[in-house]
From Swiss-Prot:
<comment type="subunit">
    <text>Homotetramer.</text>
</comment>
<feature type="binding site">
    <location>
        <position position="134"/>
    </location>
    <ligand>
        <name>substrate</name>
    </ligand>
</feature>
<dbReference type="InterPro" id="IPR018490">
    <property type="entry name" value="cNMP-bd_dom_sf"/>
</dbReference>
<feature type="domain" description="STAS">
    <location>
        <begin position="355"/>
        <end position="466"/>
    </location>
</feature>
<feature type="binding site">
    <location>
        <position position="261"/>
    </location>
    <ligand>
        <name>substrate</name>
    </ligand>
</feature>
<keyword id="KW-0378">Hydrolase</keyword>
<dbReference type="InterPro" id="IPR015868">
    <property type="entry name" value="Glutaminase"/>
</dbReference>
<feature type="region of interest" description="Glutaminase">
    <location>
        <begin position="43"/>
        <end position="325"/>
    </location>
</feature>
<feature type="region of interest" description="Disordered">
    <location>
        <begin position="1"/>
        <end position="20"/>
    </location>
</feature>
<dbReference type="Pfam" id="PF00027">
    <property type="entry name" value="cNMP_binding"/>
</dbReference>
<dbReference type="InterPro" id="IPR002645">
    <property type="entry name" value="STAS_dom"/>
</dbReference>
<dbReference type="GO" id="GO:0004359">
    <property type="term" value="F:glutaminase activity"/>
</dbReference>
<dbReference type="GO" id="GO:0006537">
    <property type="term" value="P:glutamate biosynthetic process"/>
</dbReference>
<feature type="binding site">
    <location>
        <begin position="491"/>
        <end position="608"/>
    </location>
    <ligand>
        <name>a nucleoside 3',5'-cyclic phosphate</name>
    </ligand>
</feature>
<feature type="binding site">
    <location>
        <position position="279"/>
    </location>
    <ligand>
        <name>substrate</name>
    </ligand>
</feature>
<dbReference type="InterPro" id="IPR000595">
    <property type="entry name" value="cNMP-bd_dom"/>
</dbReference>
<dbReference type="InterPro" id="IPR018488">
    <property type="entry name" value="cNMP-bd_CS"/>
</dbReference>
Amino acid sequence: MDTQPIRLPSVAGATRSAGYPTRPPLRRFLTDCHEEFRGDSSGELADYIPELKRANPDHFGIALVTIDGHVYEVGDSAVPFTIQSVSKAFVFALALETVGEERVSATIGVEPSGEAFNSIRLTNDNRPFNPMVNAGAIACSGLIYEVDGKGAFERVRSKLSEFAGRELGVDEAVHASETATGNRNRAIAWLLRNYAVLPDDVDAVLDVYFRQCAILVTARDLAVMAATLANRGINPVTGAQVITPHIVARTLSVMTSSGMYDYAGEWTYRVGIPAKSGVGGGIVAALPSQLGLGTFSPLLDNHFNSVRGLKVCEALSARFDLHMLNRNADVRTSVMADYDVYGISSRRSRQPHEQQILDERHSDIRIVELVGALNFGTIDYVTRRLTSEPPNAPLLIIDFRRVPDITAAGAELLGETLTALGNANVTTILSGLEEASAVWAAIAARTGDPRRLRRFALLDDAIEWAEDQVIYRFGGFTDVKESVHLGEQALLAELDTDEIAAIVKLSTTRHYTAGQRVIAAGAPANSLFFLQSGMVSVKLRSGVRLASLGPGMEFGEMAILERTRSADVFADTPVACLELPLDSFADYRRLHPETALKIMRNLAAILARRLVAANAKVDLLSAY
């Protein structure tokens, strides 16, 4: 095998035309790889199994599956071939699942052998070197046979089918050919039996092994199987949890050290992606959390690896810098924002005395927004930032809405930190987490008493709850059931008693029950409302809450400026309010122009405050 760096195909630019490009860049790259390497006819067909020598040397297929289940296919990706030694990785995973890690480790080692894959040799303690050589693979089949007996192969075929996301069959001709010519494997099996690694029925175990090698797959199947390993054991196409993350890690480890026969060291150096090859011409490569790759080309090099498949893997890794040991993640990027509520607030509108408390005590509420999948390194940084950096706010909100996953180690560190914060009288509120969230489940399971944690699905709800605590602690609590005098309405500020009485005379008292719609989006805007008691929410048609209003506040006031309602308003509690028709208000403006001017100035001030608050939020987000 030529070990000099290969020439990488360039990512060809798409012809410019109206509309979006028809092919994603990754598909164009894979197509270029196929065009670049299909002319390479070096290598030989496997001949030690006669049936494999019948393969078409021109076949060349590439498939790549992302962990969100998108499938790229180029060339002969749907041509079936026998899985051969690629099966070893997945049967090893099945053995771990079937008999447990302790039993597998006692039977099979995990060290590279330094010898040919079909060497008739064991370690000094009479174990196969690893599950990727024939001796180790046969031992794996033996472990499964001990549990399932005659059903062992069906268990293997069924599990590999789960990995592939479809039912897989067997090439009976290849199975017969392997059985007829597999004397070297028989020698290995009897050596294993001599040291009690295999049960008595050696021939039955060998038949399981020969059959698993003769399972028919395509390059697409291999890519899906690899992506399942890359996706922590979840098949990204079917969504099924095929194997546990713990077993995935052990499987990928052995694939890294021993998966590419005696080219494994060079492979790790050049490509750096856990992989397994087979003499049928297949290669499977799994890059954790990113992709699964499957290639098929039956021409093999002197290490029994597919010539074209190797070149595809090397080109992909080099072009997109996919080597697993060349990672550039910065733990500091896990904190998207860290701020208090100075200049910002929840969507809950506050009375002036309440807002004054929040303005004075803004540093009592700290908000930390996290982003990305969280692991040991990122959570260590987050926990140090939470516990060692000022300000030491009594109310801490940690937002997880941009966090798709957290590892067990990360959840362990975070759980300990949340417990310590609780013991230090810090009230911790977690937002962006639904009840059924896996992230919430992982954190709650590792927190001393999860009942001490407050959890909200939305960050705004968490901020509103924290604001309520600050207001209540400093004597500003408002009972929404109590009616507020109209003179406390911001829209009617500076109006005297007679002017307010005139407004009341033009208005009608309305009552609404909790959940009742008060204003419908799209309806004519022909009145405005003064909320006397209760709570209402202003929502878009999508259900997104724009504001929450309490006693002493107005809503529907934009009717003064526009004629169509832009949002819904719902009563959150029993509500009492005054409705002022716009026609009546228009008459009032003509009769009392100076009073109307005060109201319009108040409306301008209200809108200005909203704009300032919106700008503060934009500035905050722009700072991170």
